[in-house]
Every structure is written in structure tokens, then in C-alpha cells.
């Protein structure tokens, strides 16, 4: 499948600093954030005009699920638009707090852990054909996903009893299973719960929950693009070396703690391989596969960065990727800060800087400041991101959903939507079932909109 439906779900961390004596719980802060949403959507679980889903998840974490996208740049643009949507809610909530005499600054963090050790996720979704052998997908993907943090981790300072140490991944310490149908209880690498949000006879939805939330657009592109490419190769029958891991959960932590990528991890049967070895194998297969594939400039970008990132890790010389890979950008920032102020990695100010890196508010968040200075590369344009706040992808089912929502809201009609259903809640209870996520034109939806 060269054209694939993809999406990203991101849970955001929330905190608030108060200017006066009154304090609010995280639940109350979250309710302030979503008050504007509830006022028009009558719920804290809504679909937006751009086709995305916005809701309040378990533990007072706002969650944004992008609409269905069929290209990497489109997906990164809509992922970034999600940050803008949440930023608007943040600004609105701060104004409400001020009007009610509760002065405070609200912070939304696109990260994966809080100071109490809780974890929240960034989930990638990929449409795969039902006819394929799902167990083979899991078997081949698992070693890839365990070692992918070498090129896609968001970076984290981990406080251990001995000392503070810089790790590749925020999520690695919180994964407890390889493949499972649960998402919160056991936190697997791949979630197997079968909810395709499409024609179940044709498709499955692969739900990857191991990845970090990335601030870097190029890292997001690399994270999703490499996974999509490996999926494409599996579907095409490409043969891979057997890197079945003896213990994926131990391996994912070992990889996260080794910035050189050279520490051997134990494979099934007593063999060993390093994260660099494993990633090199998948990269080599990808380069070979692309020789016989139609050219795609976006995939070319992914493979180019993949190769350069592996070269940088191998040489331990990150100059050629230090504006493109999240954990490298963050580590360089910390090193400059430590050198300037003569401080240890365990200093609380580094922990504050780590958090501020993930602050999504423009003009305040550290990553945004780095981006403005040209220290973090972009692949999106502001105009495209602004448009994506209100406009769905034009090449997928998301267009049908977004157009329907816009028309119903403008006509003042009561409606219900989910990923596959569009329904007018009038006497006729008219519903259109959209089972093909690739389809952006549908006469039934046109008629439903015209009937308003």
C-alpha cells in the first residue's frame, strides 16, 4: 500500500501556576480549557471542522486526534494544527480565569511524562489491508519500533538513584508489553484491538503506542515515515533478518539508555544485536525497496534523514542532524545551558528546561524559540498550519466529515458524527455511513448537506 491512511493522536500534559491564593485541581483546569468546546459541542468529546477529534481523556489530559491523512507533510501539518487548536483553548481559558478573579498561567505540554511519573501517549495509526498476516506485521515491526527511538526519541533526563542521565525516549520507561489489546493498563508497543474505523472486511488499523510526542516536525515525519515504509515492505513480502527480541520490554529500556546505539540487546535464541545493527538492516532494506518503487519526494526525504541520523549516531557526530532530530536538539540545548551556567544534568533548572521545551504556547515554549532562531528545522508553512485548523485534508474521508460539520453548524442543525458516521438528528434520522477512508467525494454526503 503506497498510499496509506495515517493519523496521530496526542495527549497533552496540563498544569497551571496561580497568581493569587485560589488554586484549582487539574480536573478543574481541564474543565476551564474545554468550557468553550462544551458551549458549542455540548460535550468534551467533539469532532472539529477540520475533521479532527478533540476530547478530554483519562486523567484530565486533552487529546487531539488528527483527521485521516494520506501524505506525510499533510499529517505533520495537521499534527501541528492540533497544537494551534489547543493553544487557542489555553488562551481562552486564561481569559476566563482572569475574568473570574483567578489569575493564572496555563501550560500545555506536548510531552509524555509528568513530575509525578505519570505517562501519557502519542499514538500512530496506520491503515493496513485485512488480507495480510497481522502476526507477521507485529513480528517484523517490533524490533524496528523498539530501536526506532535511536532516531525519533524526544529525549529525557532520567533521575536515577546514582545520577541523572540523558535518555533517548520519554515513553520507553512506561511500556510494559510487546503486543496487547490494552492501551492504558499494560501499555504495549503495538495495540491489537481491532477497530478499523473503515470497512472491516478490507482493512485493519495498526495502532502503535510506543512513540514519543515530537516537537520537531522533521522527527515526526521520520517517525511516521519510517514506520509506514516498513509496513509497505512487509506488505510487499520483503524479507528481513530475524531480530526477534528475547525481552522487548527490557530491550526498549536498554536502547533508551544508550546514546551510542552500540550496546548489544539480547535476541531470541541467545543471539545479540545492537540498536544500530537493527536499524541499519531496516534502512538497507528500505533503500533497496525504493529502487523498484515509484519516486515520492516525501519518502526520499525520510530515507535521507534516516541514513544521516544513523550515520550521526554511529560517528557520535551530530552536527549534520542537530536541527532535525528531537533528542539531539534537546541534548545540545542542555549541554549549552550546562556549560554556560556550570551546572549538572541533575540541576532542577535542567528539569524545568526539559518541560519548557515541550510548552506549545508560541513565544513562550522553548522549542518554538529554537525554531524561530533556525535551530530547529521546519517542513510546514504557517499559512498551511493556520488553514488546517479549520480545513480538513482534501484527499481523504476527512473532507466529507469536515464539510458536513461546517454545513450543519452554519445551518444550526443538530448532528452527530464519528469516524465513519454522519448523522442529522432530525425526525428522519438521516445517516450516511462512510466506510472508505480514501474517498473524499460522496454523492450521499452532498445530498445530506444539500438537504440542510
From Swiss-Prot:
Catalytic reactions on record: ATP + [prokaryotic ubiquitin-like protein]-L-glutamate + [protein]-L-lysine = ADP + phosphate + N(6)-([prokaryotic ubiquitin-like protein]-gamma-L-glutamyl)-[protein]-L-lysine
Active-site residue numbers: 57 (proton acceptor)
InterPro entries attached to this UniProt entry: Pup_ligase, Pup_ligase/deamidase
EC number per UniProt: 6.3.1.19
Binding site for ATP: 53, 66, 419
One Pfam family here: Pup_ligase
Family indicated by similarity: Belongs to the Pup ligase/Pup deamidase family. Pup-conjugating enzyme subfamily.
Other known facts: The reaction mechanism probably proceeds via the activation of Pup by phosphorylation of its C-terminal glutamate, which is then subject to nucleophilic attack by the substrate lysine, resulting in an isopeptide bond and the release of phosphate as a good leaving group.
Listed NCBIfam families: pupylate_PafA
Function description: Catalyzes the covalent attachment of the prokaryotic ubiquitin-like protein modifier Pup to the proteasomal substrate proteins, thereby targeting them for proteasomal degradation. This tagging system is termed pupylation. The ligation reaction involves the side-chain carboxylate of the C-terminal glutamate of Pup and the side-chain amino group of a substrate lysine.
Name by which UniProt lists this protein: Pup--protein ligase
Native source organism of the sequence: Nocardia farcinica (strain IFM 10152)
Amino acid at each position: 500500500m503506497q498510499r496509506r491512511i495515517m493519523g496521530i493522536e496526542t495527549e497533552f500534559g496540563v498544569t497551571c501556576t496561580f497568581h493569587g491564593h485560589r488554586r484549582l485541581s487539574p480536573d478543574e483546569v481541564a474543565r476551564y480549557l474545554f468550557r468553550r468546546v462544551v458551549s458549542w459541542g455540548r460535550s468534551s468529546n467533539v469532532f472539529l471542522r477540520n475533521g479532527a477529534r478533540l476530547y478530554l481523556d483519562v486523567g484530565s489530559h486533552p487529546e487531539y486526534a488528527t483527521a485521516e491523512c494520506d501524505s506525510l507533510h499533510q499529517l505533520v501539518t495537521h499534527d501541528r494544527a492540533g497544537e494551534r487548536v489547543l493553544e487557542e483553548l489555553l488562551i481562552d481559558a486564561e481569559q476566563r480565569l482572569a475574568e473570574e478573579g483567578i489569575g493564572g498561567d496555563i501550560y500545555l505540554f506536548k510531552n509524555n511524562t509528568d513530575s509525578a511519573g505519570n505517562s501519557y501517549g502519542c499514538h500512530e495509526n496506520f491503515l493496513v489491508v485485512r488480507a495480510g498476516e497481522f502476526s507477521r506485521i507485529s513480528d517484523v515491526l517490533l524490533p524496528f519500533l523498539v530501536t526506532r527511538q535511536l532516531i525519533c526519541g524526544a529525549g529525557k533526563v532520567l533521575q536515577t538513584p546514582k545520577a541523572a542521565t540523558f535518555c533517548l525516549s520519554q515513553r520507553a520507561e512506561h511500556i510494559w508489553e510487546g503486543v496487547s489489546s490494552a492501551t492504558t493498563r499494560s501499555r504495549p508497543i503495538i495495540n491489537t484491538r481491532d477497530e478499523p474505523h473503515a470497512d472491516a472486511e478490507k482493512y485493519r488499523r495498526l495502532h502503535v503506542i510506543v512513540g514519543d510526542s515530537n516537537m520537531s516536525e522533521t522527527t515526526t515525519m521520520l517517525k511516521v515515515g519510517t514506520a509506514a515504509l516498513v509496513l509497505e515492505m512487509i506488505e510487499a513480502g520483503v524479507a528481513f533478518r530475524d531480530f526477534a527480541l528475547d525481552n522487548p520490554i527490557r530491550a526498549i529500556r536498554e536502547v533508551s539508555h544508550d546514546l551510542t546505539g552500540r550496546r548489544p540487546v539480547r535476541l531470541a535464541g541467545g543471539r545479540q544485536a545492537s540498536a544500530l545493527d537493527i536499524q541499519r538492516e531496516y534502512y538497507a532494506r528500505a533503500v533497496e525497496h525504493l529502487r523498484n518503487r515509484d519516486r515520492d519526494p516525501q519518502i526520499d526525504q525520510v530515507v535521507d534523514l534516516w541514513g544521516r541520523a544513523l550515520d550521526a549516531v554511529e560517528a557520535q557526530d551530530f552536527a549534520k542532524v542537530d536541527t532535525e532530530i528531537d533528542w539531539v536538539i534537546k541534548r545540545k540545548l542542555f549541554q549549552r545551558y550546562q556549560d554556560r551556567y556550570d551546572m549538572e544534568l541533575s540541576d532542577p533548572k535542567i528539569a524545568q528546561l526539559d518541560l519548557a521545551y515541550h510548552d506549545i504556547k508560541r513565544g513562550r515554549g522553548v522549542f518554538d524559540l529554537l525554531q524561530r532562531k533556525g535551530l530547529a528545522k521546519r517542513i510546514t508553512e504557517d499559512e498551511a498550519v493556520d488553514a488546517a485548523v479549520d480545513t480538513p485534508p482534501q484527499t481523504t474521508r476527512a473532507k466529507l466529515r469536515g464539510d458536513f460539520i461546517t454545513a450543519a453548524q452554519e445551518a444550526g442543525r443538530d448532528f452527530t458524527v464519528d469516524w465513519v458516521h454522519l448523522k442529522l438528528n432530525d425526525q428522519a434520522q438521516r445517516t450516511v455511513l462512510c466506510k472508505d477512508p480514501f474517498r473524499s467525494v460522496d454523492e450521499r454526503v452532498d445530498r445530506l448537506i444539500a438537504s440542510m
